[in-house]
C-alpha cells in the first residue's frame, strides 16, 4: 500500500483538484503496478464524497479527522454508502 498525501494539504482542509489527484494516482500506479494507492491529506466528512468519486483511489488515510469519533464514523459511513 502506498499513501499519497501532498504536504500542502496536511491539516489545511485543502485537497487537490479531482483531475489533478486522478492523474497523480495514475502516475503512482503506473510506476508501482502491484500496489494499492490510498489518499491522505485533509480527508474529512465534508470532502470524502468528492474524493470517493475519484475512481482510482483505493482507500483513505485519515489524519486529524480520526481524532474526533463522530467525524471518523461519518467518514466511514460515507465511504461505504
Model segments located where?
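Conserved, mostly hydrophobic/aromatic
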Residues: 5, 51, 63
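Short helix-capping segments at alpha-helix termini
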Residues: 30-34, 55-56, 81
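Short, electropositive alpha-helical surface patch
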Residues: 17-25, 52-61
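Short, hydrophobic alpha-helical segments
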Residues: 76-80
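Hydrophobic packing residues within well-ordered alpha-helices of enzyme cores
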Residues: 28, 51, 72-75
Amino acid at each position: 500500500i502506498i499513501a499519497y498525501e501532498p504536504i500542502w494539504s496536511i491539516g489545511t482542509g485543502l485537497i487537490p483538484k479531482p483531475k489533478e489527484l486522478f492523474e497523480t494516482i495514475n502516475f503512482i500506479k503506473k510506476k508501482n503496478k502491484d500496489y494499492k494507492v490510498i489518499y491522505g491529506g485533509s480527508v474529512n466528512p465534508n470532502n470524502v464524497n468528492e474524493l470517493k468519486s475519484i475512481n482510482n483511489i483505493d482507500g483513505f488515510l485519515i489524519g486529524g479527522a480520526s481524532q474526533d469519533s463522530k467525524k471518523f464514523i461519518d467518514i466511514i459511513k460515507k465511504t461505504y454508502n
